[in-house]
Swiss-Prot record:
InterPro entries (alphabetical): GMPPB_C (IPR056729), GMPPB_N (IPR045233), Hexapep_transf_CS (IPR018357), Mannose-1P_guanyltransferase (IPR050486), NTP_transferase_dom (IPR005835), Nucleotide-diphossugar_trans (IPR029044)
Gene Ontology biological process: cell wall mannoprotein biosynthetic process; GDP-mannose biosynthetic process; protein glycosylation
Protein name: Mannose-1-phosphate guanyltransferase
GO molecular function, one term: GTP binding
Gene3D superfamilies xref list: Hexapeptide repeat proteins, Spore Coat Polysaccharide Biosynthesis Protein SpsA, Chain A
CDD domains named in the record: LbH_M1P_guanylylT_C, M1P_guanylylT_B_like_N
Places the protein is found: Cytoplasm
Keyword Repeat attributed: no
């Protein structure tokens, strides 16, 4: 089987992290985001993966070579010379996606969930039509494009309603699809939208179905959602009794959902959790309080610091008695001085912060 992952451009929404690494290589749950997807696709029998990108960073090429060997898949880049939207990249990769009649998966690189690729492929085969989109239920459908089914048909899609004013349903497009190669005939090689142009055309022919996603789902393309997605992912691991989580019997674990890389060092009298990810070679001093945060590789948190709703980038250091909260993001190699308060700062790489940041701001 084949798959195309829509990676796109420079990941500006996730800056300052994406100033250091391309978004697919930023670690989510201590593994590059793209690895969650590659692993799930390979497990479902996918052998060819295409990454649709606007630019091809060399660092990605070498990282993905490693995954090719590890998961026995072929990973190719399809590089757009101009941004082609969400449908154009499929046409650009037609030579790979249409090399046989088997259907192919398409997914957005920002989506984290329990990927249901195997079940999705079986469902798609059963109904025998042209396309299936994965949908997820949301509490506030008015913010999204909602999927409406045909009367008396649980999966065949009748129409899409963008940001509905009155309730028409609560299922939204989850950014994952399985499509027959015939769909490519509907797409021109130009900037074009799969959601607004291709899918409505397939719906008019009665050929598009939806598949309900069980479990959690999050688009983690910006820091606030990256943190929420981390909470959902850790909760999902807890439900599965995953060995990736620190046992609640550890003296520092407070409230569960804590992932600690084996190489990290944790001081005395710390309270860590709920919903914390600690990366490789992280050093945490004594009496530190961490909740709902991500600490990336080689970062350092000194004694008695207090960190909540924050992403601490690689090689960064947080001083003694410092306090970080309110979706603060430290880029690579940022230093926060002792006793400094940061309230929602987005701090670019290699900066040193010696003064409080009382209101959310970008520090360049």
């Amino acid at each position: 089987m084949k798959a195309l992952i829509l990676v796109g451009g420079f990941g500006t929404r996730l800056r300052p992290l994406t100033l250091t690494l391309p978004k697919p290589l930023v670690e989510f749950g201590n593994r590059p985001m793209i690895l969650h997807q590659v692993e799930s696709l390979a497990a479902a029998g996918v052998t060819d993966i295409v990454l649709a990108v606007n630019y091809r960073p060399d660092v990605m090429v070498s990282a993905l070579k490693k995954y090719e060997e590890q998961y026995n898949v072929k990973i190719e880049f399809s590089v757009e010379t101009e941004p082609l939207g969400t449908a154009g990249p499929l046409k650009l990769a037609e030579s790979i996606l249409a090399k046989d009649d088997s259907p192919f998966f398409v997914l957005n690189s920002d989506v984290i969930c329990d990927y249901p690729f195997q079940q999705l492929a079986e469902f798609h085969k059963r109904h025998g039509d042209e396309g299936t989109i994965v949908v997820t239920k949301v509490d506030e459908p008015s913010k999204y494009g909602v999927v409406v089914h045909k009367p008396n048909h649980p999966s065949r899609i009748d129409r899409f309603v963008e940001k509905p004013v009155e309730f028409v349903g609560n299922r939204i497009n989850a950014g994952m699809y399985i499509l027959n190669p015939s769909v490519l005939k509907r797409i021109e090689l130009r900037p074009t939208s799969i959601e607004q142009e291709t899918f409505p055309a397939i719906v008019r022919d009665g050929q598009l179905h939806s598949f309900d996603l069980e479990g959690f789902w999050m688009d983690v393309g910006q820091p606030k959602d990256f943190l929420t997605g981390t909470c959902l992912y850790l909760t999902s691991l807890t439900k599965r009794n995953s060995k990736l989580l620190a046992p609640n019997s550890e003296p520092y674990v407070y409230g569960g959902n804590v992932m600690v890389d084996p190489t990290a060092k944790i001081g005395k009298n710390c309270r860590i959790g709920p919903n914390v990810v600690i990366g490789p070679n992280v050093v945490i001093g004594d009496g530190v309080r961490l909740q709902r945060c991500v600490l990336m590789e080689n970062s350092k948190v000194k004694d008695h610091a207090w960190i909540k709703s924050t992403i601490v980038g690689w090689n960064s250091s947080v001083g003694r008695w410092a306090r970080l909260e309110n979706v603060t993001v430290l880029g690579d190699d940022v230093t926060i001085a002792d006793e400094v308060y940061v309230n929602g700062g987005s701090i670019l790489p290699h900066k040193s912060i010696k003064q409080n940041i009382d209101v959310p701001a970008i520090i360049m």
